[in-house]
Amino acid sequence: VKIRHKPLRTLVSTAVLGVLATGALHAGGFSLYTEGAGYTTGNFAAGVAAEAADASTGWYNPAGLVLIRDQQAVFAGVGVFPTAKLSGVSTYSMINPPPAQSLIYSEVFNNINGAEDAFVPSFHYALPLGENATFGLSVVSPFGLATDWGPDSPVRYQATFTELITTNISPEIGGRLTEHVALGAGLDLQYARVKYNRILGAPHIMNALALNPMLADSLTYNKGHSFGVGFHVGVLGMFNDNHTRLGVNYQSEMRHEFYGYSRLTGPLAVPGNIFAPTFPQLGVFQSDDLFSNAIDLPDVVTISAYHDVNEKFALLGSLVYTAWSSFKTVQLTNVAAPRFATPPPLSVVGNFSQVKAISVSPQNYTDTLRVAIGANYHVNDKLMLRVGGGYDPTPTNDIDRDVRLPDTDRWALSAGAHYQATNNIGVDIGYTHLFTSSDPVINRTDALTATTSYNVTASGTAGANLVGVQATWTIDKEPPAPTK
């Protein structure tokens, strides 16, 4: 086997910078399963652990690398264009025991938008190591989330801007065990960055004083980083002269513990009294030792099948089990926050100072099973068409679901194409439309203190369009020998 090494360091550096610079948006919880390559948007990633279409098989099932017999680089990206609109009512309540007066402030809203467009790039590389083994390298973003409701929105006390970006670098190896069985494994080195913001305020008090309810609003900005290590392993069965393939891939759970800082900006960031004539005075209070609990991103099991019906037509399918039940809560410690003094004496009424607080957000996700089916049709030697679709249930529940991720069950329809432009360059395009089986529903209550709570009750519309593009460079492929 002739191997001509290309500037791999340059290819990988470019790919890593691309993924690090990207925002991401949720798909199926906040999994970016379909976005691991570009061509997968053309069939909703049906059969992805068995097809071994290109070097991206190193991520979806590294055993499939044995079928990549030429050095290859894949550059891909998926544009995510979502819809997330909510209508409902938010209620900030202070329920005091009699004879004290209870204070309630409500806002009614209609079709507020929290969706954020995103671009998710990926890079894959394959290098044959003799006749029976292939090395691979994948740079992907397996999980991501971005919603932005804005600091003035009616749901600001639950969330404003939320972002999760992950970058996963995986060296992989696939080897043929027998004529019909191949094994593969990859090491997952994953960097994650999170932003988890909201507004803290006292709209119930300001409203009772006939003042602007937003007068005390202060932004708590929380940012953290984490690094985790995991793995993925796969097996591929090849039968019927390789026209029938069965693949299984296991992606391990990834544990993250985020460390960073928390910054409170606004009137509640400096000591004062909300009844003082000088209120509000703007300030900044920062906590530099913010950290989270151990957050376990789920392990994933993919079972895929691929079958060539004839020389032009192939069928594909996948079952993807995601163990979301590992994601139970998000707890941030040392969050920059205000603390109001509790009387008696009455002289302290309205006084507030700054503290490093603990913020707990229950999630209690449940495991999900995603289904995808698809087909390939070879029009000629240069053009292949793809279609697919499937069902992807939400892991969220009706009690803990909040506006950071207004998720619901969804169906998918996909179409795409591969065009072999030259002997060495192939181009893929794909499109997936995600539409919901029911409207997303929010009915979340956050306990802020022993007597104060914040509730958002809403329903709305959700969906997304995914547009994938991919260029596959087969670096070492020799041109076909002339026939004359």
PLM regions: where:
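Gram-negative bacterial Sec-dependent N-terminal signal peptides
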Residues: K2-H26
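Outer-membrane beta-barrel porins/channels
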Residues: G28-F44, V48, L86, I95-Q101, ...
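Single transmembrane alpha-helix segments in multi-pass membrane proteins
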Residues: N43-L65
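Short strand-turn segments of transmembrane beta-barrel domains in outer membranes
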Residues: A46-V48, Q72-F81
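Short active-site-proximal "capping" loops at secondary-structure junctions
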Residues: G64, G79-T83, A185
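Short glycine/proline- and acidic residue-enriched helix-loop micro-motifs
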Residues: L103-V108
